[in-house]
């Protein structure tokens, strides 16, 4: 937060936390309390926090992220009243949960949406592929978000700089076909 203020970054992406198999409720509460403290401090510094919806891990994984599904993410937003805590919508994370991209977006809409993170996958596991290498319908996603009047920014979340350049060009071509 201090570095963001110093370099005038204006926002910091944050995660709700993680849990192990037996400590879900305790970790969920600890994550919320940490985000509240961070929100208070960030507000005083003039920095916005963006809570990212995370990816689910396989059921047999030792560690699981928090804020992976609509219910968990809603818990955090309902209990984080700070106007300076927005949403970083990671589309490829939503693509691997049952409600999908549209269902996850519709649960929250534009109210807190500040950033849309873009990568592709095939909907079956956590991947950050170059757009066009998976099966996300980016035209449908852009139409859904842009038709609502989104005024935030998009961010590429995959690969190296060359991958991002190629992915950006793919997405621009997709936008031209809308």
Model-based region annotation:
Residues 8-10, 36-37, 48, 61, ...:
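Histidine-acidic metal/acid-base catalytic patches
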Residues 39-59:
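Catalytic cores of phosphodiester-bond-cleaving enzymes
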Residues 1-33, 43-48, 151-153, 158-161:
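Structural motif corresponding to the early beta-alpha repeats
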Residues 16-24, 53-63:
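Active-site-proximal beta-alpha loop/turn segments in soluble metabolic enzymes
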